[in-house]
From Swiss-Prot:
PANTHER family: RIGHT ORIGIN-BINDING PROTEIN (PTHR47504:SF5)
Cytoplasm keyword on record: yes
UniProt DNA-binding region: 25-46, 73-96
This protein's GO CC annotations: cytosol
Alphabetical UniProt keywords: Cytoplasm, DNA-binding, Transcription, Transcription regulation
Source organism (scientific name): Bacillus subtilis (strain 168)
Compartmental location: Cytoplasm
Name under which the protein is recorded: Uncharacterized HTH-type transcriptional regulator YdeE
Length: 290
């Protein structure tokens, strides 16, 4: 409940500064968390990125102002953070489907995105199995690719990464594994802004957690010493896993005393048989106490 109140305080600050430069660090302070965690929590709770929410709100208010006043288009563009009439017109057209000058006349349909507030919804109260782990610094060694974000079903780009690993490479990675999570793992990091809108990208690794030197033919990701929240997922793949991932942000973080810090989100699978109805996975997320 306190988290929702603090998030709404941050939203109030953003709403009051839609015609100014928004200080995201100040918004995060009002939410009693880091800027990184604030943006991630907002995205998962709202279903869109913070920057996209701000863009929609500004263009909503701009449409109202165009409709209800005689203020010049260039003045409205500058007021809502656009440096030129052209950039404003493109953004306006993309959202509303018409150019700003036509919005002044009746008969045109415009989109409105109301101010957002977060409210508590009581759901089924299904348990979540998790543990907290402290880990020294290590590195993830393996193959790396920039891939699109996909919410539902199998990500074909990630599937192709797995297919590219021959038996020799898999055995080499398993030999490198000497710290938990053991064996082959996946890791996602460097998420783009569109993470929650399924139009962003991320850096995806398939490899091993290790303290050993990275061979020349593999990529590596250095991971600093961190505290990790480890969540268990048991059920049909990938639906159960994707459900747990969503609940981590919509349920666990809001009710915990932790916030996420920058670092990779790691996935460990018990075995390769994804057809098992009791497929077991673990999600590792780097955290810190608030």
């Amino acid at each position: 409940m306190d988290l929702l109140k603090s998030m709404n305080r941050a939203l109030k600050y953003i709403e009051e500064n839609l015609t100014n430069d928004i200080d995201f660090q100040e918004a995060a302070k009002l939410a009693f968390c880091s800027e990184y965690h604030f943006k991630r929590m907002f995205s998962f709770l709202a279903g869109i990125s913070l920057s996209e929410y701000i863009r929609r709100r500004r263009l909503t208010l701009a449409a109202f102002e165009l409709k209800d006043s005689n203020v010049k288009v260039i003045d409205i563009a500058i007021k809502y953070g656009y440096n030129s009439p052209d950039s404003f017109a493109r953004a306006f057209q993309n959202l509303h489907g018409i150019n700003p000058s036509k919005a002044r006349f009746n008969g045109h349909s415009l989109k409105a995105y109301p101010r957002m507030t977060f409210q508590l919804t009581i759901k089924g109260g299904n348990e979540m199995n998790y543990r907290i782990e402290e880990k020294e610094a290590f590195r993830i060694v393996g193959i790396k690719k920039r891939v699109p974000i996909i919410f539902k079903g199998i990500n074909p780009e990630i599937a192709s990464m797995w297919e590219s690993l021959d038996e020799k490479a898999i055995n080499k990675l398993k030999e490198l594994s000497n710290v938990a999570p053991s064996g082959l793992i996946s890791a996602s990091t460097n998420f783009s802004e569109g993470r929650t809108e399924e139009n962003g990208e991320l850096d995806h690794y398939i490899g091993a957690a290790t303290t050993k030197r990275c061979p020349d033919n593999f990529s590596r990701l250095e991971v600093p010493a961190s505290t990790w929240a480890v969540f268990e997922s048991i059920g049909p793949f990938p639906d159960t896993l994707q459900e747990v991932w969503g609940r981590i942000y919509s349920e666990w973080f809001p009710s915990s005393n932790y916030e996420q810090i920058e670092g990779p989100e790691i996935l460990w699978n018990e075995h390769k048989d994804v057809t098992s109805p009791s497929f077991k996975s673990e999600i590792w997320i780097p955290i810190t106490k608030k």
